[in-house]
Amino acid sequence: MPGQNYRTISEFILSGFSAFPQQLLPVLFLLYLLMFLFTLLGNLLIMATVWIERRLHTPMYLFLCALSISEILFTVAITPRMLADLLFTHRSITFVACAIQMFFSFMFGFTHSFLLMVMGYDHYVTICHPLHYNMLMSPRGCAHLVAWTWAGGSVMGMMVTMMVFHLTFCGSNVIHHFLCHVLSLLKLACGSKTSSVIMGVMLVCVTALIGCLFLIILSFVFIVAAILRIPSAEGRHKTFSTCVSHLTVVVMHYSFASLIYLKPKGLHSMYSDALMATTYTVFTPFLSPIIFSLRNKELKNAINKNFCRRFCPLSS
């Protein structure tokens, strides 16, 4: 309203876990801590295996390493703060720290989506154009693709963060979430620009994510068409099995994201919001290295060769 005085907010209060029973918080802390450590260990194990095993020095595993790095950084940007809030009652976060957390969560989230899209393209070239693979997926070209995914994630993250934090925040400084979640933060904004910024943020996010999903689906349409032309059932199964881990992670990534951003308005409470948000911020990065290492026979054998047999001789 014209002439209304807005107080300057220098910090926010994260109240995402305030609705949980106090006796449940230590259990959640231990669970999320173990998942956080396993996420770091699993992704570092994948990266170390690819680094050591020379036959894994291919575009597919370069993209997988880039994905592991983005998952590690995404997890580090969110989970330590969440673990601290589970232990301590003082859950404030400064205005600047909130903006930084939002930027990194969006940056690595967008980068993750872009990398999944590039990995889909890699599978498409491998199966549909095997004779031209070395030309289309040259080391220099793959390095450029990885660089563009990170640059794109950085630009998109900066764009969304600047749009949100150029708004005026008034009234309550309590964010009903365990992190600086964009939708929860926008509810605290006021002024004439708020509605247009909300539309802008949604447009940027939906355009980027749906665009990536569309290109992934398009890649798999061509992949399935090529697989169906393989005469033997064994050949079809072997070819499709190379894509299963990537397809599983894509489905998981977009399914959990939909739980957060596309859930019906009627299903809304701090308790349910926090639980659903952890599926994307904690559970997805936790499952990704498991899926890639278990569903990828070549990677699983390399891990067993370089680590399991070396450090666990009894298991061999």
From Swiss-Prot:
GO MF terms held by the record: G protein-coupled receptor activity; olfactory receptor activity
Segments on the Cytoplasmic face: 47-54, 121-139, 219-238, 294-316
Subcellular location: Cell membrane
Extracellular side: 1-25, 76-99, 161-197, 260-272
Origin species: Homo sapiens
Transmembrane regions: 26-46, 55-75, 100-120, 140-160, 198-218, 239-259, 273-293
Keywords assigned: Cell membrane, Disulfide bond, G-protein coupled receptor, Membrane, Olfaction, Receptor, Sensory transduction, Transducer, Transmembrane, Transmembrane helix
Keyword Transmembrane helix: yes
Topology class, membrane: Multi-pass membrane protein
Protein's name in the database: Olfactory receptor 10H3
Free-text function comment from the UniProt entry: Odorant receptor.
PANTHER family named among the record's database cross-references: OLFACTORY RECEPTOR
Cystine pairs: C98-C190
Classification via PROSITE patterns: G_PROTEIN_RECEP_F1_2
GO biological process: detection of chemical stimulus involved in sensory perception of smell
Gene Ontology CC: one annotated term: plasma membrane
UniProt cross-references to InterPro entries, sorted A to Z: GPCR_Rhodpsn, GPCR_Rhodpsn_7TM, Olfact_rcpt
Family under the similarity heading: Belongs to the G-protein coupled receptor 1 family.
